Amino acid sequence: MLRVTLSRQLSTDWNDSVKVGFIGLGNVGAKLAGSLLRNGIDLVVRDLDPATTQQFRNSGAKVAQSPREIAETSEVIITCLPSPSVSASVMEDPDGVLTGLSEGKIWIEMSTTAQQEVFRLGKKVEALGASFADCPVSGGCHRATTGNIAIFAGCAREVFEQILPLLVMMGRHVLHTGDAGSASILKVVTNYLATANLVSISEALVTTKAAGLDLATAYEAIRISSGNSFVHETESQVILNGSRDINFTMDLVVKDISLFQEVAEREEVPLELSPLLIKIFRDAEQRYGPREWSPNVIRRLEDATGLDIRANGFPAQIIDQEPEALGQEVVAARD
């Protein structure tokens, strides 16, 4: 169920008046920050890679020398970082965000992180008179490029209304998931499901090849059937091409599904599949390296069978074909 967002005029007002700081210009962060810049936001960025920050400087953004400077000069501070430990460091170091934060500002955490870390850091933010929201994204790096990715927002409704004009610049579908921390749980839930799908697709494609069937035909059979999925329509294509490039690495998968497992263990849910997925990806990470593209988990079966799971006619990278547009709030249907 979709609801039209706040007016475009409100978004225009943000363009003219609000300074936004963005920390973390990695695979996803750079794309989200780029969407803000394209929409005319007064943006200041911070990243450890000087080449990346220079690209943003060339496109009109300002570059800060520390997270503290970002917090001091921005009204909204966005972080998009690779792990909970990095997020903690960026927030709590002597030159971190917390040292520059003040009353009335908003911290938006767009990293995939643990709910407990969101709560812990959020309390420190609130103690300074500022507000916070956890807003992880889902849908693949290719959709982040065009501003068509999905965004989950866990925060007070009042805070959500304040930041919605920014969120719809970065994402096509924006869902207010409830209180702070709720979005972080749903993010790792969706990543767990995507991981399970990737492993099952890998097994399906290798088994299909072993049975002597054409892989391009198998791709179409799955696509038009009950076995289809978002992961199949995207990641299967780069698997069959051989590039395996979806801008997402083994170590990030291990982090995300481990966070999901932590949630289940905390709530005393006796999962069976999740521990197996962690074992599979840790093995793949050890074999092929933590920075290997995650679809290369299929190499475990390619190595075991001697089969080459490639086919002609598939792209090396997934490109989002949907035109960029201002996003919308998604509203959960309730009686």
Model-derived regions: residue spans:
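NAD(P)+-binding Rossmann beta1-loop-alpha1 motif at the extreme N-terminus of oxidoreductases
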Residues: 2, 6-80, 105, 110
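Rossmann-like NAD(P)(H) cofactor-binding subdomain of soluble oxidoreductases
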Residues: 69-72, 76-77, 81-149
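Hydrophobic beta-strand scaffold residues
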Residues: 43, 63, 132-133, 174, ...
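Hydrophobic residues within alpha-helices
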Residues: 32-33, 121, 166, 207
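Helical "substrate-binding/catalytic lid" subdomain
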Residues: 182-305
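Rossmann-fold dinucleotide-binding core
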Residues: 14, 20, 25, 112-192
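NAD(P)-dependent dehydrogenase/reductase Rossmann-like domain
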Residues: 286-335
